[in-house]
Curated annotation (Swiss-Prot):
F(1)F(0) ATP synthase produces ATP from ADP in the presence of a proton or sodium gradient. F-type ATPases consist of two structural domains, F(1) containing the extramembraneous catalytic core and F(0) containing the membrane proton channel, linked together by a central stalk and a peripheral stalk. During catalysis, ATP synthesis in the catalytic domain of F(1) is coupled via a rotary mechanism of the central stalk subunits to proton translocation. This protein is part of the stalk that links CF(0) to CF(1). It either transmits conformational changes from CF(0) to CF(1) or is implicated in proton conduction. One of its GO terms (cellular component) is plasma membrane. It comes from Bacillus caldotenax. InterPro entries: ATP_synth_OSCP/delta_N_sf (IPR026015), ATPase_OSCP/d_CS (IPR020781), ATPase_OSCP/dsu (IPR000711). Keywords: ATP synthesis, Cell membrane, CF(1), Hydrogen ion transport, Ion transport, Membrane, Transport. It is a peripheral membrane protein. The keyword Transport applies. It comes from the Bacteria. It is found in: Cell membrane. This is ATP synthase subunit delta. F-type ATPases have 2 components, F(1) - the catalytic core - and F(0) - the membrane proton channel. F(1) has five subunits: alpha(3), beta(3), gamma(1), delta(1), epsilon(1). F(0) has three main subunits: a(1), b(2) and c(10-14). The alpha and beta chains form an alternating ring which encloses part of the gamma chain. F(1) is attached to F(0) by a central stalk formed by the gamma and epsilon chains, while a peripheral stalk is formed by the delta and b chains. The keyword Transit peptide does not apply.
């Protein structure tokens, strides 16, 4: 089974537990912290895959390292360890945070532009496109693309809205030909 699909199942389960226990905010803080701690400490991951350590010893290491994390997060980490799926933590974190954003009516977008967009322009884009995709808020990351002549391309999920000058010229060209 695809690793992304498996991670999404764990993320969905953790999300449901967070909702049921009223700990969504706490777990939303814990998940990125765990992901970052693991990303910054490769030795810890190596230690967890060390064959001479027993499962109980590895569990003790996780409990100690993540003692400050909520119980559902600790239990998820322990379950991933037991099922030899600890490498899914980064993808699980991404999936979990996407579920939280979705529940809060937030979508992520990338705006490609020839120049840096002002805060006002980003707010205007957010307002227009949030409404288009049925979300309350659109968090936009602005990436400067020197290939663009002008205008903006906005990517939300797997959809691209082409508002670039070159895109407009291409549409005009097709209308004239066709």
């Amino acid at each position: 089974m695809n690793q992304e699909v498996i991670a999404k199942r764990y993320a969905s389960a953790l999300f449901q537990i967070a909702l049921e226990q009223g700990q969504l905010d706490r777990i939303e803080e814990d998940v990125p912290a765990v992901r970052q701690a693991l990303a910054e400490n490769g030795e810890f991951l190596s230690l967890l895959s060390y064959p001479k350590l027993s499962l109980d010893q590895k569990k003790a290491l996780i409990r100690e390292a993540f003692a400050g994390a909520s119980t559902p997060v600790q239990n998820t980490l322990l379950l991933l360890l037991e099922r030899h799926s600890f490498g899914l933590v980064p993808e699980l974190a991404e999936q979990f945070l996407a579920l939280v954003d979705d529940a809060r009516g937030i979508a992520k977008a990338v705006a490609y532009s020839a120049r840096r967009l002002t805060d006002e322009e980003l707010r205007a884009l957010s307002d227009v496109f949030a409404q288009k995709v049925g979300k309350q808020t659109l968090e936009i990351e602005n990436i400067i693309d020197p290939e663009l002549i002008g205008g903006v391309n906005v990517r939300i999920g797997n959809r691209i809205y082409d508002g670039s000058v070159s895109g407009q010229l291409e549409r005009i060209r097709r209308q004239l030909i066709g």
